[in-house]
Amino acid sequence: MLDTKYPEIIPGPPKPSAILQPRVFSLPPGTERYVVPGAGAILLRLETGDRIEIENTEGGQPCEIVCADLLGGFDAGLIGARAQGAPSGLMALLTSDDPSLRGLRMGIEARGLNLSQAGAVHLFEHSTPAGTTESFTASREGIVIIAAPGGIMDFQAQDTATPLTVFIRRAVLKSAARFELPDPLADPVADIRVHSATAEAYFVKAGDYIQILDVDGRQCTDFQCFAARKLDKGIAHALDVTTTRTLMGHAYPMPGLHAKYYDQEMQPLVEVIQDTCGRHDAFALACAAKYYDDIGYPGHINCSDNFNAALAPHGVAGRAGWMAINFFFNTGLDDHGVMYADEPWSRPGDYVLLRALTDLVCVSSACPDDTSAANGWNPTDIHVRTYSGKETFQRAVAYRPTPDAEPKMTKQTGFHDRFARFTENFIEYNGFWLANCMSTAGPIEEYHACREKCVVLDLSALRKFEITGPDSEALCQYIFTRNMKTLPVGGVVYTAMCYPHGGMIDDGTVFRLGKDNFRWIGGSDYGGEWIREKAAELGLKVLVRSSTDMQHNIAVQGPESRELLKKVIWTAPHQPKFEELGWFRFAPARIGDDQGVPVVVSRTGYTGELGYEIFCHPKHAGAVFDAVWEAGQAHGIRPMGLEALDMVRIEAGLIFAGYDFSDQTDPFEAGIGFTVPLKSKPDDFIGREALIRRKEHPARVLVGLDIDSNVDVGHGDCVHIGRAQIGEVTSSMRSPILGKNIALARVDVAHHEVGTRVEIGKLDGHQKRLPATIVPFAHYDPQKTRPRS
């Protein structure tokens, strides 16, 4: 008989896809999140019944709240609270010239508020634990101003200013839209809503600004423009992405030096000033009828037809498919040359800010594609605002320390104006504009000045965190690989910080300011997040607060740096004299004399030379730089940028995150095994067991390479013995002093012996090879005699 048994099946109904997304997309409807930056403030509108919750994100940050009704009357009772004094912290902030407070000033002026007559609700103390919250409910409509006051940080008191997080839970949803439109950057000239699956054309004068906003996030928008004068002559030369890519040398322009879009005659049309997303498409056409026809959706509405309809009144002939820059469209080319697309990176409120370089006729669409992930499977609206050319907007991109973080726009360091005297070549690095090289010299001259005389460079983008409290030493001992119990007050130690599996989170330095006072200086914001998370998990009595914006720093490096700074740095009698400062030691100091600008000076650096770093509040940066620069004239001082810094650090074998190590690399594989005292450190630390295993059974080793060729080698180039790949290049440079091409590479432990001959693969890794030899690490002064001198 036939077997009549039913086949096995997968039981039950289907389950939804498990997708983890940034918190902004998972907030319940009617809930909004805002961040008040340290030493900053925001203005928010409240309606009856709205609930507001304020979180002391990092701990220890006081808060001031000013409430006003719709008539401008101040009343803390609007949120059921009582005023406890004047908003002195808020008023002090508003006297500063901080551009981030521009929108707040506009809001206060527009409402005619006189803060000198206001009372403030004061929340939190300097000892308030991280994560502490206070909640209020609005009894009627009005506005609240929430401030996180902060002044010039005392480096020894470590009284930094840190963010507050604000949640508003609306009693009544304002509209059908999930997300509200952010406030304008200035007074708009035009406010244009581009509804889903439509396009709008608009005119923009030369010099004016165009802000293109993604209202709800994950929404693409094609943008096209024409020089109005050409259109008047019947010439419809549109923005040409092929010409633009060729002239800019980038997939698409970004704020900075490579920021302009051109037409086919190479006339610049617009310049990118700000970009909070950083992911766009300049390869594919705007979606067209043929695309939908070919995938089985004939008659589907499309951006090209919408462009044709919007541009027809301006005398522009229709096209079957429009070339465009598709803002927020997430595309790329894989290793096989296949173009792919996925959900956009854009969040609600993300935008691109352009400046018109000539009178323009523009058109913007809200892409209708609901057949793919191009719009997150849910097409929504786009919004366009234009602003007068009389407004001033700094060039910036958005930086998010973590996926859940609110965007931070690129900042200028306190030293920016001083370096801008020598160059316009600044690059975005970790949320700051830093000089790449000097137009007055160039990286080779800067390199030689560092090796032979002295240089000054801006390293303000380094992340600083204040670790304070009775359990601070215990926390540092557990978090960092080095032994913090042996670190004296006034001492600095270079260390790694690892995950439990032994992979590195970051490398950096720890300063000990007191018995219970430490400062971590590393390369990433996440290092501080990790330290704070561990403190909370362990229940330790310690605060971990960011101070990056309170401490900007220059490095003065080179053989003559000590003689130079002897003329500049004053230390108190109970501190070591500057010239007595030992390697990896620091001291609070002042510029010039006991009345000078307060600084912290450390004998540390990232060049392989004798050198120092000077930390100060951004407001004092100009005075610090000027004093160093003036004293340095007799010592041949030169400004140095990141390009030359990369050269000297590679020669000296100093590692760089993202190149020489990652979270898949342990300190031994990164060449800094000396930071892991497995036998001498008496206490456990995160990653110890994994590091013991990795040390006893190594897989890869960081080595030096001497390359028998002047052909440039790059990060990620493969290293071979015969057909087999045995490693990859992590960093490389052409050494002026050594007179050869050198590199750092991570190779299999089976082939790491000095003298081993290898080949570096170019092109596809096989068609072109560069012979090289494994040499001792590091190439330049491996015993570090120069920084010790």
UniProtKB/Swiss-Prot annotation:
E.C. designation(s): 4.1.2.32
GO molecular function, one term: lyase activity
Catalysed reactions, semicolon-separated: trimethylamine N-oxide + H(+) = dimethylamine + formaldehyde
Gene3D superfamilies attached to this UniProt entry: Probable tRNA modification gtpase trme, domain 1
Phenotype upon gene inactivation: Disruption mutant cannot grow on TMAO or its upstream precursor trimethylamine (TMA) as a sole nitrogen source, although it can grow on dimethylamine (DMA) and monomethylamine (MMA).
Region forming the signal peptide: none
Coiled coil: none
Keywords: Lyase
One Pfam family in the UniProt entry: DUF1989
GO cellular component: cytosol
Function text: Catalyzes the conversion of trimethylamine N-oxide (TMAO) to dimethylamine (DMA) and formaldehyde.
Family: In the C-terminal section; belongs to the GcvT family.
Name used for this protein in its record: Trimethylamine-oxide aldolase
Species this chain originates from: Ruegeria pomeroyi (strain ATCC 700808 / DSM 15171 / DSS-3)
Originating gene: tdm
